[in-house]
Structure formats: structure tokens, C-alpha cells
Amino acid sequence: MKIGFNHEKYLEEQSKYILERVNNHDKLYIEFGGKLLADLHAKRVLPGFDENAKIKVLNKLKDKIEVIICVYAGDIERNKIRGDFGITYDMDVFRLIDDLRENDLKVNSVVITRYEDRPSTALFITRLERRGIKVYRHFATKGYPSDVDTIVSDEGYGKNAYIETTKPIVVVTAPGPGSGKLATCLSQLYHEYKRGKDVGYSKFETFPVWNVPLKHPLNIAYEAATVDLNDVNMIDPFHLEEYGEIAVNYNRDIEAFPLLKRIIEKITGKKSIYQSPTDMGVNRVGFGITDDEVVRKASEQEIIRRYFKTGCDYKKGNTDLETFKRSEFIMHSLGLKEEDRKVVTFARKKLELLNQEKDDKNDKQKTLSAIAFEMPDGKIITGKKSSLMDAPSAAILNSLKYLSNFDDELLLISPTILEPIIKLKEKTLKNRYIPLDCEEILIALSITAATNPMAEVALSKLSQLEGVQAHSTHILGRNDEQYLRKLGIDVTSDQVFPTENLYYNQ
């Protein structure tokens, strides 16, 4: 993989800049946008970026930091899913707490924003409190967004409980957008100033990158990633007017800035030090870019990947046609097409060959599916669905054989291992879908490795699949999707269901 980003330089630059901000105040509240951990989007568009870079920045400042996690009550009730991990927001809060503690970062509390007394929310709060985690309930802000006098009063932010903090830097994060991070920060500012403390507010958003051109693929990839939010990158007019400098921001921050500035000035009783939404940010990611062309190419691939993802989401009923059309427009606006993702053509060609073989045999029953992997050295490996295993499982085994320099005809897993598993699924468990998925095939390979040295060698190559690009001719089942993700394989799919069943194999 070609590198286009200097991770170490970024860590130094970012931690230094945050410290400079906090030095102006008794305390600094930082609203952390995007992913605090496992920022896979940033990793894909900035080759060389560490997906856990943000947590490493915080770790460098851990003696000065504590973390507040926000989650919107409505997202708990609706079981909103974090797309890149396939887990609900409430479960992602638990994951966040574990990860923060593992990195020696203090978790202050969890805030339920726009709180309403509903069953799922009540259960979530109980589970947190019984594990010794403080929970605060914050309500919808009275007067928001137009009545600043009510917002900044005991009837507005004053109705929320004050969160006791002890560190000079308070990071406010969440599982995803719309979780109430900004409202929590402003509520805390209100309470802090009422207590006579001089506190500040800043925002840490990785994207869009303010000092990269508006139409750069890196910034357009952010639009593709947030197409469901209808985010649009814009030149920051406030920054341009105040400093005569071009800076990129996005529509929601620019639209909210005049109100946000008024609220902060009302809370502090003095003129805001920020003259633009860009001023509020502490992001230094643009200074870590070392090869613009590498970043451009990676960002273009991400735009295509997002198009496929949105298409599958539309097919599954998880998004609307307008969102999919926006994703398609973004891809076409850069002159990109589906086939610019190399593995797409190979997967489709494999399916064509399989269909031709099926026609030759006059086989009308068999449902065919294929997948293609692009290995780190550019080699294309394919897999097909069979009665024994599904296409991703076959591609994984074929890839491991390639990485191990084994003959393609070699059977890595003995039929004596596979047949009892198939029998268990079909006869005992009475499963409707029999072929082994990625999890099952990897367990079978692990068992085989105990007595088969070749299987042991193949198993040792699994880590080399990280970063592999893949494309499936059919929408993958949840299990396969999750296991490919765990292996670090970036997979896209055509908008075609593998069967006509509505429940089985989805």
C-alpha cells in the first residue's frame, strides 16, 4: 500500500494544538465529531492514518483529560445501528467505555440527551448504573433554536443537571451524529460560568479538512460518507470575510454558527473569540498529508465504495431513493464509475462464467454467487458459492492458499471435518441455509490446523488479509459482512439479494 499520510507528525501537531487551546481557559470542552475509535473512513482515505489516531492523541494528554459520552434517547428506542460495526448505539456506548478505559482514559459519565422516560432507555440506564457508571438525563432545550434568552436561562440549559468534572480538558463524544454533543457542551458552559469559571469550547472534526480544497476528492469523500445526513461542503463565508482566507466547512456548522456565537456570547457575557466555525475547530489532519496523489486515489475509491454501500442500504430498505441518487451523483461528478473499483469487474466476470456453466448443464435450481478479492500485491482471487460453503468463505480459503504458496487444488479442510458440520446444520439444527459462512469455515480451518501443518500455515496468513479489497455479486448476509470486516477486508456488493427468501440468509 502506498502511504500518503504521516501519522507521527499528525499526533505531535494535534496534541500540541489542543494544549494551546486549553491554556487560554480554566477548562476546555471539546466536542469530538466522527469516530473516536476505529475511524475506518479516515484510514481508507488517508493511507497511513491510524484508525485509532484520535484515541492516541488523547492518550498523550491522558493526565489532563476525562470523557463524557452522549447518546440520544430516541436512538436507543429505535435501536439505531452503527453501520461500520453493525451494533446498536447503546451497545457501542459500552464498547466505547471499555476502549477508553483500556487506553487509561477516565470516563466521567454517560449523558442521555433529549431524555424521555421510555422502556429501552430506562433499561439502558439501569444497566449502566449497576456497573457503577454515572448517568445524567438532559432534556430538550426550551426555546431552541430561536429564543436565545430562554435557551441561556434556568428554563433552558439550567434545567439540565450539572456534570461534575475535575480535569482541564473534557472530551464530549458519542456513537454517532445527532447525539447531543454540542448541547451538552453548551449546557456545561452555562453551569460553569454560573459558578464563576472561565471555560472554553472547541470542536474536533476530522472532516471536511478545512485546509484542503473544496472539490478535493478527500472532502468529497466526506460528503459521500454523510450522504444520509445531506451534508454539503462549503467555503466558510465567515472565515473568508474575517481573515480573507479560504477554509472549508460543512453546511450544518456554517448555518448554525451565528446562533452558536450568540449563545456563547450570552453565556460568557463577552465577545466571542471565534469569528468563524473554522476558528472553533482544532483539527490538524491536513498537515499530516505527505502525498496528495495517493490521498486523491484512495478518496476516489472510497466514494465508489460508499455508492455501493448506499445502494445496498436502499435495496434493504434502510435508506431512501433520494439518498442513493445523491450518492450516485457524487460518484459521477468526479467522472467515476462502478468499474473503477477493480474487483467489481472480476467478480461480475466470475459470475458470468458460472452462469454460462449452469446454462450448459441446464441447471435451473442452483443460485449462483461470486466474490473477488484484490490481494496486497494486486493479484485477484475469486470464490464461488457451493453446496459446502458460500462465496466469501471460498475466497478466504483460496486467498490463504495463495499467500501460503499452496497449489489451488489443495484441500485445506478435510471432508471429515466439513461433513459433520454440514450434517449438524441440516439434520439436527434443521437450518434452511446449509453452506458454511466465514465464521464456520474459519472454525473448521482452526480445528484442522491442530493436526494438519498446511492448514496451520494457511491460518497464520489470516492477518495478511487486512486491507484486501473485495466485491460480491450479491448482498452479503450479516455474519459474512461482520467477519470480513473483522479481518480488515473492505467489501462492497451489487444490489442483488442472493435468494428470493425474505428471512433466511439475510
Swiss-Prot record:
Pfam family, one: DUF1846_C
Domain of life: Bacteria
UniProt xrefs under InterPro entries: DUF1846, DUF1846_C, DUF1846_N
Family indicated by similarity: Belongs to the UPF0371 family.
UniProt protein name: UPF0371 protein FN1121
Organism the protein comes from: Fusobacterium nucleatum subsp. nucleatum (strain ATCC 25586 / DSM 15643 / BCRC 10681 / CIP 101130 / JCM 8532 / KCTC 2640 / LMG 13131 / VPI 4355)
